[in-house]
Amino acid sequence: MHKSSMSEMGFGFHVDNTIGSTPQINNWTQDWIDFYAEHRLVYQLRLAREHYADSTIYQKGQKLARNLRLLFQNVVIEPCLLHGDLWSGNIAYDKNGEPVILDPACYYGHNEAEFGMSWCAGFGAAFYNAYFEVMHKQPGFEERKDLYMLYHYLNHYNMFGSGYRSSAMSIIDDYLHMLNL
């Protein structure tokens, strides 16, 4: 799906949709970093501020969002169609044993963003090895993995409450430290 589905419109989707029960804004944007910062991270940070009056996560998260470009040096990003919420609970098999993916939150984005739910997906080394035989592994992939998990931790914080806040805050703090911000 990632290799064969490129977008001429840029990053986004022709309609907004949802990620779980949270609205997911998909306005077309020509730059991936701008799209991810504004429509994924900043949107979720605003929800956290509105729902929980959480100014700490909002301010620190905003600082990270303004500096995302530092994590994408020498990275070529082509928009490809993403499932958007890929984890073990959204994968099943039909009666013939063929895989079926459920409950998509589709948009065109950076292929690495697909792994944002890896913390509950059960993807092991064999999965990643097979994937990167087909798709080129970009420089800095390991350093960006948590960045894509952050979106989903923030979304879970907004949907399910404070149990997910510490994971999101830890990722933000780690990136602020890594980037000397």
Residues covered by each model-derived region:
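A cross-family kinase active-site recognition segment
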Residues: 1-54, 78-79
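Active-site Asp-x-Gly
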Residues: 24-37, 46, 75-81, 88-146, ...
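A ubiquitous structural signal for well-ordered alpha-helices
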Residues: 44, 64-67, 153, 171
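Short, conserved active-site entrance elements at the starts or edges of catalytic domains
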Residues: 55-68
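Generic structural signal for well-ordered alpha-helical scaffold segments
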Residues: 65, 69-73, 132
